[in-house]
Amino acid sequence: MNLLKRYAAPVACAAAVLVFAACSSTKDARRVPTPLTEFKPVLDVQQVWTASVGKGGRYSFSPVAVGDAVYVAGANGSVEKIDAKTGQQVWRTKIGSDLSAGVGSDGNLTAVGALKGGVFVLGPDGKQLWKATVQGEIFSPPLVGNGLVIVRTIDGQVIAFAAQTGEQKWTYRNRAVPLNLRVSAGMTFAGDAAVLAGFPGGGLVALNLQTGEPFWQTPVSFPKGVTEVERINDVTGAPTLVGAETCAVTFQGQLGCFDANSGRPLWEKPFSSRSGVAQDDTVVVGGDDWSVVSAYDVATGKALWRNDKLKSRDVGVPYLLGRAVVLGDYKGFVHFLSRDDGTFVARMKTDGSAIAAAPVLAGNTLVVLTQDGGVYGFRPR
């Protein structure tokens, strides 16, 4: 089925926590964050405003941009719409629950998720429109669009609600795995026919927006190893989609790109990421478990460049901005790399807390959200 042409398990969390503790421990000499080196900036980037929302706490919150507005949220229940041109607050709402995931918005409706399964949807003025509860923890931002609000739970459920009324439309349940990562794994619309989602166990699925049934499903990679920890093989981050090609990456697995209409594999490379990748019509870029950033030709998978100068700095999901690759690190630095060769072209500083989510572009303003709730607007010149 031509989707794009036709339409413009119980979680053993302790072990998963141990996996991340091992990966980020500075007591391991191999994991000591690489000191930043000086360089001559060749891209002029200006900080034009700053704002604040609630801290992320233990959870990773992602900003979302629609037009000239950016939507952000924090663990304390704060949800905010900001004018990205000025940094001024348009509206701010306090949800009466601690949040664990957000934000999703189509510019009209805005949705966030709570740890105990609460789904809160706000109208254009920021006032609560409806609330629903799902059975499971929500760590990934809801997806809003095509008349639906779609949420996913840590145990592999994807649930769709009617955007205006909150009526539950369908539920998809992925097969359970013995152990998975408690991390944000987003979703991506494929036109107005399907939604793409990756799952624990390494699977990538295109779900029918009308019914929740799979159009296709394919493995990004397969579990390897003997122990349950060694066999963790989750798709991390949101699947990317440009044209008819979608790419996804797994933890302890592979980076792969696929035909979005059929799920047919186009190419794959050994890779492991806890955050996700970025894609445009020429390259796919991501940081691996060691925070070594690599770029690949999107058509062939050929390696283009590799930058190990951010090794062990826990880089987040990249954003492709013109001729630059932009990503944050564990100390709140925003790094701009040349998309041609991966060298540094600019660097900006925030509040010193981690930047895990991808930056977003709202109008001509690049916006980043830190773990401490700092919202920063930058403009390259």
From Swiss-Prot:
InterPro entries: BamB, PQQ_b-propeller_rpt, PQQ_rpt_dom, Quinoprotein_ADH-like_sf, WD40/YVTN_repeat-like_dom_sf. The keyword Ribosomal protein does not apply. Its main location: membrane. One of its GO terms (cellular component) is cell outer membrane. It is a lipid-anchor. SMART domains: PQQ. Keywords: Cell outer membrane, Lipoprotein, Membrane, Palmitate, Signal. HAMAP family: OM_assembly_BamB. Part of the Bam complex. This is Outer membrane protein assembly factor BamB. It comes from Burkholderia pseudomallei (strain K96243). The gene is bamB.
